[in-house]
Amino acid sequence: MKIPANGFTHAGKFHADDVFATALLQILRPDIKITRGFVVPDDFDGIVYDIGFGMFDHHQEPREYRANGVPYAAFGLLWRVLGPGLVGERQARLIDENFIQPLDLNDNTGEQNSLCDAIGFFNPVWDSKEDQDACFFKAVAVAKQILEHQIESANAVNRADEKVQQAYQNSRDGIVCCPATCPGKTVCIKPMPCLWSTPASAAAGALSA
């Protein structure tokens, strides 16, 4: 999906849902212009989310639910389409399960979530003179850093998986020797006993000999 130059989401109090959805769009298109409002302009040309009853708005019936019963919010709806292109299908699913679903659940049901609470604290207090949009984009900047690290970590696992798969294919006598210490043992799924060796473990063995 090509990200357009303009995005529109709801104004007023913001939540982790619309904040992380905005962060995702900024990661994919850093120059995107996000506008907040209470009504989507009739002539708006761009992506609309968390408002407007479109593809990326969960405030409509019938609601969309995951197979495990967790309802989608805007962030989850966007990630379902855009996430696999960033980290691949498997890692996109894992990020959804472990990171996004708790945020979506909070937005839809009020289920307690510390990260959602932290993002919510960026909203100006009742007697503040701060501009609400400015506060929103401060929260987006923080969410963007968190999401960027999620994506970076997921792609690091993808790279490690490739290394381990290659090492497994080159294994001899049940010994898998990886060129570096990496988080990839979970890809060794064949029912074959494996002895893992890395440069670090080999060096440790030499020192103890």
Model-based region annotation:
Residues 62-63, 95-99, 153, 160-165, ...:
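Short, glycine-biased loop/turn motifs at secondary-structure junctions and
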Residues 105-183:
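Hydrophobic, aromatic-enriched interface-forming segments
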Residues 166-209:
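Gly/His-enriched, cation/cofactor- and phosphate-binding structural elements
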